[in-house]
């Protein structure tokens, strides 16, 4: 397959290079990724400002391009400017740290995959669970084998797969599970600190809350050493609540 690879950790981050090296053993790979780290930029795109694209050479077996923008910018430019056609598959990652539960809302990695989904390209976001000790080779080996058994052409437009891989040696993985995006979230707080001149600044902190009763919650699979595979959608309409609203306000809604 012709695979376009992007990320949010930056074009020369260890995760994306590990992923591209493994994929290039069996596929044609092109890397188009941000020239600087873009973690937690969500689905931002660059408007009314220029974007720069440059090819970089670090002696790899695949072409690498750096973009002065976000992961979503990279996907757009990768398809329209670099490849000039849709690839067979887009993979965003390997992210340093998980993208579980509400992480998905903020993640540049996941947004890169969703941008591919908008463009009609089968797309996958992949993350290594641990930020402190990400095992990229485990995730790279997994995705290479996963592509042998999973029909990526079955992924419908506007849908992407969000994959989270436990940070354990590859041989310790128990397999993969189909999961749901969980209600895993953070209880945020801000720590006040002093800058060198004595002024106040704030550092955002957070405690993880994992109390989702759903047995298919994504984080539960990862905790049990399974790879979590969650189909996610570009569209955010709460269909259940919409139906309840329609029933309640049917006579009052403007037609």
UniProtKB/Swiss-Prot annotation:
InterPro entries: SurE, SurE-like_Pase/nucleotidase, SurE-like_sf. Gene3D superfamilies: Survival protein SurE-like phosphatase/nucleotidase (3.40.1210.10). Pfam families: SurE (PF01975). It catalyses: a ribonucleoside 5'-phosphate + H2O = a ribonucleoside + phosphate. It is found in: Cytoplasm. Binds 1 divalent metal cation per subunit. It is an enzyme of class 3 (hydrolase). A divalent metal cation binds at residues 8-9, 39, 95. Its EC number is 3.1.3.5. Nucleotidase that shows phosphatase activity on nucleoside 5'-monophosphates. Belongs to the SurE nucleotidase family. PANTHER family: 5'-NUCLEOTIDASE SURE, 5'_3'-NUCLEOTIDASE SURE. This is 5'-nucleotidase SurE. It comes from Thermosipho melanesiensis (strain DSM 12029 / CIP 104789 / BI429). The gene is surE.
């Amino acid at each position: 397959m012709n695979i376009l690879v992007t990320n949010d950790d930056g074009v020369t981050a260890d995760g994306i290079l590990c992923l591209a090296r493994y994929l290039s053993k069996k596929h044609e790979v092109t890397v188009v990724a941000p020239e600087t780290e873009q973690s937690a930029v969500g689905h931002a795109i660059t408007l009314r400002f220029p974007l720069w694209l440059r090819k970089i050479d670090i002696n790899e077996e695949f072409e690498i391009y750096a973009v002065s923008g976000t992961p979503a910018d990279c996907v757009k430019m990768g398809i329209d400017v670099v490849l000039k056609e849709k690839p067979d598959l887009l993979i965003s990652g390997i992210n340093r740290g998980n993208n579980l539960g509400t992480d998905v809302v903020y993640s540049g990695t996941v947004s890169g995959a969703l941008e591919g989904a908008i463009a009609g390209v089968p797309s996958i976001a992949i993350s290594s669970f641990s930020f402190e000790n990400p095992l990229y080779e485990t995730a790279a080996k997994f995705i290479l084998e996963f592509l042998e058994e999973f029909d990526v052409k079955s992924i419908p437009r506007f849908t992407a797969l969000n994959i989270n891989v436990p940070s354990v040696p590859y041989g310790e993985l128990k397999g993969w599970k189909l999961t749901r995006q969980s209600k895993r979230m953070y209880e945020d707080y801000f720590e006040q600190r002093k800058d060198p001149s004595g002024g106040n600044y704030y550092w955002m902190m957070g405690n993880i809350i994992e109390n989702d009763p759903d047995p298919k919650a994504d984080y539960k699979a990862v905790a049990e050493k399974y790879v979590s595979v969650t189909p996610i959608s570009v569209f955010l309409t709460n269909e259940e609540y919409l139906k309840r609203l329609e029933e309640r306000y049917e006579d009052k809604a403007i037609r």
